[in-house]
């Protein structure tokens, strides 16, 4: 096992697996495998089987020791977690007993400068979790000023998004923006923070990472796939790290835990009956001890729900945010 893997600490790991309630003979999906923290806890239950999914081939490769230790109870698949229903079907597990997902970038990726996720270490401006498709450098080079401002405002919730976008466009006219340090310095030149505030580039880097990896689209699709894949009584556990993700999870679970509205023309039918029962009336957060040991846990929120026997609801595929395909196709304005 590599040093990077051994250093990684799963956020809210104990709570997540308690809600998952693994048992012997059950099949569980660690939909964002990373360093396998949740998988290890599930595999500690004798007879439990895990299907681990990660789009990062490095995460899959570095889990070789854990696969061997699991003695056939852990299967790893390199894929997007939005495809978890198809992955499970390919592993002869079209219905599973539980799904856990930890949304966002892993500390393994942040710690490696060559992955280009962190403004604290200089490296290529990449940010791709799966090393395919457009990189952050590509987006910064091609996107129009308007698109950049929208991306940074929507996905980073950065109130200085227009100033940041202008600064990026101005800088790229001089020379390409190819490294994390160069971009961080550009952002810091227009976003001024107090000494105890977060780094001025934090929100811009978050926005680009979410956009490049289509994380919100992936999350929406993964939630719908989970609804289709869980057995009645199966549990969904999701850990998020910022308000955009948490809002999506909260709205999804709440919508599916209530009966769809009917009318005198179309009364409620079985397909709109609740497909989930909420297990966490309020999100679970990390305690002081976990935050002290792992500062990343400070912003974490855990939500959990249990699948009912009712049919899945229709998937909501209408997204009101910029998409990678549209922005890269449109180019500079």
From Swiss-Prot:
Tell me one GO molecular function of this protein.
Answer: rRNA (cytosine-N4-)-methyltransferase activity
Q: Where does S-adenosyl-L-methionine bind?
A: 36-38, 54, 81, 102, 109
Q: What is its EC number?
A: 2.1.1.199
Query: Which processes are annotated in GO (biological process)?
Result: rRNA base methylation
Q: Offer a single GO CC term for the protein.
A: cytoplasm
Q: Which reactions is this enzyme annotated as catalysing?
A: cytidine(1402) in 16S rRNA + S-adenosyl-L-methionine = N(4)-methylcytidine(1402) in 16S rRNA + S-adenosyl-L-homocysteine + H(+)
Q: What class of enzyme is it?
A: transferase
The UniProt entry lists the main location of this chain as cytoplasm
From the Swiss-Prot or TrEMBL record, state where the protein is found. Cytoplasm
Q: Which NCBIfam families did the record assign?
A: 16S rRNA (cytosine(1402)-N(4))-methyltransferase RsmH
Q: Which family does this protein fall into?
A: Belongs to the methyltransferase superfamily. RsmH family.
Q: Which PANTHER family match?
A: 12S RRNA N4-METHYLCYTIDINE METHYLTRANSFERASE (PTHR11265:SF0), S-ADENOSYL-METHYLTRANSFERASE MRAW (PTHR11265)
The name of this protein is: Ribosomal RNA small subunit methyltransferase H
């Amino acid at each position: 096992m590599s040093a990077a893997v051994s250093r990684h600490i799963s956020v809210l790991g104990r709570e997540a697996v308690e809600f998952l309630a693994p048992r012997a003979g059950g099949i569980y999906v660690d939909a964002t495998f990373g360093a396998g923290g949740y998988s290890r806890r599930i595999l500690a239950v004798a007879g439990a089987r895990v299907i681990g999914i990660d789009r990062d081939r490095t995460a899959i490769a570095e889990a070789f020791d854990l696969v061997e230790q699991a003695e056939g109870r852990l299967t790893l698949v390199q894929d997007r977690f939005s495809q978890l229903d198809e992955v499970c079907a390919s592993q002869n597990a079209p219905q599973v007993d539980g799904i856990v997902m930890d949304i966002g970038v892993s500390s393994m990726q942040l710690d490696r400068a060559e992955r280009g996720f962190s403004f604290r270490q200089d490296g290529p401006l990449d940010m791709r979790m799966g090393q395919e498709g457009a990189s952050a450098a590509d987006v910064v080079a091609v996107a129009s000023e308007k698109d950049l401002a929208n991306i940074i405002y929507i996905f980073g919730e950065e109130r200085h998004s227009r100033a940041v976008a202008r600064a990026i466009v101005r800088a790229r006219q001089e020379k390409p923006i190819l490294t994390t340090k160069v971009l961080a310095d550009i952002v810091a030149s227009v976003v001024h923070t107090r000494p105890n505030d977060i780094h001025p580039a934090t929100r811009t880097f978050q926005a680009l990472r979410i956009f490049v990896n289509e994380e919100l689209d992936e999350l929406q699709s993964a939630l719908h796939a989970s609804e289709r894949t869980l057995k009645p009584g199966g549990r969904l556990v999701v850990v998020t790290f910022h308000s955009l993700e948490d809002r999506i999870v909260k709205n999804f679970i709440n919508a599916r835990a209530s009966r769809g509205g009917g009318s005198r023309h179309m009364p409620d039918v079985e397909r709109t009956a609740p497909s989930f029962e909420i297990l966490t009336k309020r999100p679970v957060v990390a305690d002081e001890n976990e935050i002290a040991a792992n500062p990343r846990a400070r912003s974490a929120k855990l939500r959990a729900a249990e699948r009912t026997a009712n049919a899945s609801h229709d998937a909501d595929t209408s997204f009101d945010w910029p998409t990678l395909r549209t922005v890269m196709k449109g180019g500079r304005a």
